Amino acid sequence: MNQLGRDDFRAYSAGSHPQEHIHPLTEQLLCNYNIDTGILRSKSWQEFVLPESPQMDFIFTVCDQTAGELCPAWPGQPITAHWGFEDPAKAIGTDQERLKAFSRIYNEIGNRIRIFLSLPLHKLDRMSLQRQLNELGKN
């Protein structure tokens, strides 16, 4: 989102059950795309419910496991949608095969982000936008 959304969006990443470190294949994939991983760290989504947290307009959950989880009460009432993807960390095989799974999910997420960015956000009311984002999560 930070690369595709230019200056229109600032994206953050967090999880319900963060690991101690970013997955090594995630780092490798991002490095392959010349994305700086130096400032990235694994973090809990609870960091984004604190008073000093950045204001969120949209929150997309992406892990197939979070679909049934109780999400935090996000401050500011952002629009939320679930875009379920397979967890590439669960892929089995050689490192190359596993990296291919990470790459596939990276591309799938990128495709959804491109569609999101193509929506006429300033012309859609909140309910219409919510429907669009929910529908996007089904495809």
Language model segments and positions:
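Phosphate-binding/catalytic loops
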Residues: 70-139
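Structural signal for conserved beta-strand scaffold positions within catalytic alpha/beta enzyme cores
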Residues: 13, 61, 81-84
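Conserved active-site segments centered on acidic
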Residues: 1-49
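Short amphipathic alpha-helices and their capping/turn segments at secondary-structure boundaries
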Residues: 48-51, 69
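Generic detector of well-ordered secondary structure
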Residues: 3, 32, 62, 110-111
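Alpha-helix C-terminal capping/helix-to-coil transition sites in glycosyltransferase folds
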Residues: 54-55
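Short glycine-rich anion-binding loops that position phosphate/pyrophosphate groups of nucleotides
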Residues: 64-67
